[in-house]
Amino acid sequence: MLTLTLTPLEWEALTLSLRVALWSMAVSLPPALAVAWVLARCRFPGRTLLDGLVHLPLILPPVVTGYVLLLLLGTRGPVGAWLNETFGIVFAFRWTGAVVAAAVMGFPLMVRAIRLSIEAVDSRLEAAAGTLGASPPLVFLTVTLPLILPGIVAGAILAFAKGMGEFGATITFVSNIPGETRTLPIAIYTLLQVPGGETAAARLTGIAIALSMLALVGSELLARHISRRIRGLDAVR
């Protein structure tokens, strides 16, 4: 019979995954919003290249992405060595490195969701606000942002779910250290290598599925609620 009682190591893996997913979502949101805006509204040489680079983690094997992160941000890498010597910041084999890996893997999903929302905005609404004297920042805050909020929510939740399930890039970049970098997927993988670990792996698998479904369903419901509120405000106006 499957028991839902988790061992301390399993709780560590679960809480670490939640922390990594939340942090990766938070640190990805500002740059994702900026990049999505640039890709949706700006025309410049190299735009296609930027779009390709943003979506590259979706195409590359996650292990390759993790290895590139290790080459760049490892203690001997050009960026990692500089961060370590200058600020004492180390990402490789730390939980913060797992945040970086999850953020990189979830970034394209967030950018795409926000970009589609920006492209769907009727530019005439923004132009009308501008003719009424609103500055560009005010137009963005009062007109554009409320309209693209469902896309932001959807992108953030997708990035969170991706962070919860990230495995290949994480284990390549930060390894499998109990209590430090052993996230939920890595814990499941580890348990499957141990005789008799199938029951614990099944528990964690069920939890991972439940959390992912909860995030996706919650995202859909929240996006619908925001859309209804926006339509209601438009009707009042």
Regions found by a protein language model. Give the residues of each.
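C-terminal transmembrane helix and the adjacent membrane-cytosol boundary/short C-terminal tail
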Residues: G46, P108, R112-E126, G130-T131, ...
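Hydrophobic positions within alpha-helical transmembrane segments of bacterial inner-membrane proteins
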Residues: A21, M25-L33, W37, V63, ...
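Transmembrane-helix boundary motif in ABC transporter permease subunits
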Residues: W23-V54, Y67-L69, S117-E119, R124-L125, ...
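Periplasmic/extracellular loop-to-transmembrane helix junction in inner-membrane transport proteins
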Residues: M1-A26, V38-F44, N84-G88, T190-T199
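Non-cytoplasmic
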Residues: G74-T75, I152-T190
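Transmembrane alpha-helices
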Residues: A26, V111-I114, I118, D122, ...
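Interhelical loop and adjacent transmembrane-helix boundary motif
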Residues: M1-L9, F173-M213, G218, R237
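Membrane-interfacial helix termini and adjacent extracytoplasmic/periplasmic loops
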Residues: L2-T3, G66-A103, F173-P178
